[in-house]
Amino acid sequence: MAILKERTFRYSYSKEMVFNSVDTIAFPMISFCDLPLSEFSEYIGKYGGYSIGVSRSWGIKIGVNPVWYCDFYSNVVHSIMKLLLRELNSSDYGYVYELFEILAYIKPMEDKLKTKRVGYSKYRFSDERELRIVPYLRDLESKSVKPFLYNKLYEEYKVSNNNSSLIELGESFEWSDIKYVIVKNKTDVKRVRKLLKTFNCDNEDIGIFYQQQVKADFIGIEHNKVDMPTLSSTDLSHIQNLITQLQNINPINWQNNIINHENN
């Protein structure tokens, strides 16, 4: 609950595979899913124990952008890679920072995903509709923050930072910017309400829900458990007669039609 206590989303290094032929690169970022609660069931609890819903106007104010989902082998990614290599070979590194700004918003449409709870061999990231904000990389050096970390340096940073990828920079918010909080269990709801009071929260309209409640009440996770009516032999016979009547109304020799289609 540090985010609520500090009223700040802190940037953290997040590893991204921007090119299929190089190691991962970790950029400092803050990420959100642009999904309504009705489409949130697949992602509840996937990246952490609780979720915070913020207003779209707050996101626009701080400058979030949709992630650019690309295929590793697309012409776009290949062109960016060629430009980056050219700039890295120049005497003054030219537009290297600007190109890395673009790379920081690129994410594969599908790739492997491993979280603390579960792993996927082929996860479709584009379904998350991720919004992301990355600080201006060129300005980070003056704040003693590395603009990006390659794989080994990223692991070393986490070891030196108590296994955390967070940095000191962040984006603050007002209580009025928070729409809801989703906690893990029903017992956590009262605890979070008390915490908000101790944090001097003055927004009484913040909804606090627990994960199973959201899945069952808002999304309808129980719909698959509804018993479907069983058809009797009489019902089946009646349906078969209707099909026969429809075929007679539109007499088409289906077998010949299929054969002709295959021959063509």
Please state what every model-predicted region is:
Residues 1-264:
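NAD-dependent ADP-ribosyltransferases
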